Regions:
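Glycine-rich, acidic and aromatic/proline-enriched surface loops and short helix-turn segments
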Residues: 55, 164, 396, 434-437
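Alpha-helical transmembrane signal-anchor/signal-peptide segments
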Residues: 350-366
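Membrane-embedded alpha-helical bundles that constitute the cytochrome b-like, heme-associated redox core
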Residues: 1-283, 287, 296-326, 336-349
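Extracytoplasmic electron-transfer domains, predominantly the class I c-type cytochrome c fold
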Residues: 384, 401, 406, 410-466
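Electrostatic cytochrome c docking/interface patches
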Residues: 367-395
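Signature aromatic-anchored transmembrane alpha helix within multi-pass, membrane-resident enzymes
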Residues: 331-335
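Terminal regions of secretory-pathway proteins
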Residues: 337-345, 361-374
Length: 466
């Protein structure tokens, strides 16, 4: 049996070279100084794989349209087995990946590992950091709650303010002052279709460059015998990865991530709050108002990125021990103090978070029933076109988050079955346009539909049976 197994492995290795390459990878020479400070790269790759895996699991139950995204998130959090855990792993995994990538770059900068011939490796790392931050930016909108909506409005407004490119960026983002279906679709496409393969290819290129030039040594390594990656460094990397997973799993289980209320474009009093890793930029914008806003939102971040890319070409001094890189330490301390100070100021000056949605985590909310066909169960295949169009508009606006139809939906507003027997068409139309006038104290926003939309949605509502 053992001889047969050896023949199989020999056949595979002869055809694919997989065993030879694995051995070459594990037994590669690394500097004698290698140790704990070089585990961050492996942890970052692990967290990327976690993000890909949990993202795929979430996508199985996520509806990528504004009308259904919010309800599908409710469904994931309430009905899908381990849905809240997967959501927590994905959310906190994004934050941890940013932390680990930043720590990895700090370690590389502190040790001077970006110096010749490793300039391209450093630049690939900078681009990976930007891609990691872009994940958080594009994924922020996808829950389609108030926090997601208004946070993205700020992003699109910043993009619109970029000199010369503003109008083109707004068009690219599908936003001309508001955030709608086009913006949602493009953020989703970037988050799911573009960023993962781009990140995977860049990680592969980064690893190839590291293997080509080797792990950067420190002064004195040439006087000591080199080590093999396996077993000691592989063991340290494994311990670091396991520790990261324990921290991530604990956060996903303990830290509750409630949805806020359904995105409300009319809630102009809402104060958007970005994720913690963007709070420093959020605070910096407060110091640059009016014509100077573009300086804080575009110019300073752009200069910082440009400077990061140029570091290997600016610092051409000989490699020295970390203890002698005083200027590098001062730069890290200064950057950390600036980031920490701005973040702390943002936390102190930001009002409490928005009101969480009233979600019964013990009760089922099947978003698959919140489709035009199911919402209009009284409207079968012979239903008039206006009723079908109205059902689609009802879904698009997320009305089922507050109103129950055929026993499915929210309970914030009155159930809509039998509406035609309780209200006239004129009353419903006026309620859409001036809800506070018709029902003082209501939380329902105004919906100034055009004539066709108004006719369609009222027609649909009046086809819903008792």
């Amino acid at each position: 049996m053992k001889a047969f197994k050896n023949r199989v492995f020999e056949w595979l290795d002869h055809r694919t070279g997989i065993e030879t390459n694995i051995r070459k990878f594990l037994y590669e020479d690394i500097p004698a100084s290698s140790g704990w400070h070089q585990v961050f790269g492996s942890v970052a790759v692990f967290l990327f794989l976690v993000q890909a895996f949990t993202g795929i699991l979430l996508a199985f139950n996520y509806a990528p349209t504004p009308g259904e995204a919010y309800n599908s998130m409710r469904y994931i959090l309430t009905e899908v087995t381990a849905g809240r855990l997967m959501h927590g792993l994905h959310h906190w995994g994004a934050s941890m990946m940013i932390v680990v990538v930043v720590l990895h770059m700090v370690q590389v900068f502190l040790f001077g590992s970006y110096k010749k011939p490793r300039e391209a490796t450093w630049i690939a790392g900078v681009v990976l950091l930007l891609l990691t931050l872009t994940y958080g930016l594009t994924g922020y909108l996808l829950p389609w709650d108030n926090k997601a909506y208004w946070g993205t409005v700020v992003v699109t407004q910043i993009a619109a303010g970029v000199p010369l490119l503003g109008p083109y960026l707004s068009r690219l983002l599908g936003s001309t002052g508001d955030v709608g279906v086009v913006t949602f679709a493009r953020f989703y496409a970037v988050h799911v279709l573009l960023l993962p393969p781009a990140t995977g290819l860049l990680i592969l290129a980064h690893i190839v460059l590291v293997r080509k030039h080797g792990v950067a040594p420190v002064p004195g390594d040439d006087q000591l015998p080199s080590k093999k990656f396996y077993p000691r460094q592989a063991f340290l990397d494994t311990i670091a990865v396991f520790t990261a997973f324990v921290i991530l799993f604990t956060l996903a289980v303990v830290a509750h991530l409630p949805l806020e209320r359904l995105a409300d474009p009319s809630d102009t009093a809402y104060i958007p709050r970005p994720e913690w890793y963007y709070l420093f930029l959020f605070q910096m914008l407060k110091y640059f108002s009016g014509p100077m806003e573009v300086f804080g939102s575009v110019v300073l971040p752009g200069l910082a990125i440009f400077l990061l890319i140029l570091i290997p070409f600016i610092d051409r001094t000989p490699l020295v021990r970390v203890s002698k890189r005083v200027f590098a330490m001062a730069c890290i301390v200064l950057a950390g103090a600036a980031w920490g100070g701005l973040t702390l100021a943002a936390v102190k000056s930001t009002p409490p978070s928005g009101v969480a949605a009233s979600i019964d985590y013990a009760g089922p909310i099947d978003w698959m029933q919140l489709t035009p066909a199911a919402l209009g169960r009284g409207s079968d295949k012979t239903a008039p076109d206006f009723a079908v169009a109205g059902a689609k508009l009802f879904t698009k606006k997320g009305c089922a988050a507050c109103h129950m139809v055929n026993g499915v939906g929210g309970k914030l507003g009155p159930p809509l079955n039998g509406l035609s027997s309780r209200r006239s068409e004129e009353w419903v139309q006026e309620n859409f346009i001036h809800p506070q006038k018709m029902a003082p104290g209501t939380i329902m926003p105004a919906y100034p539909f055009n004539e066709t939309e108004m006719r369609n949605i009222i027609g649909y509502l009046f086809t819903i049976p008792e």
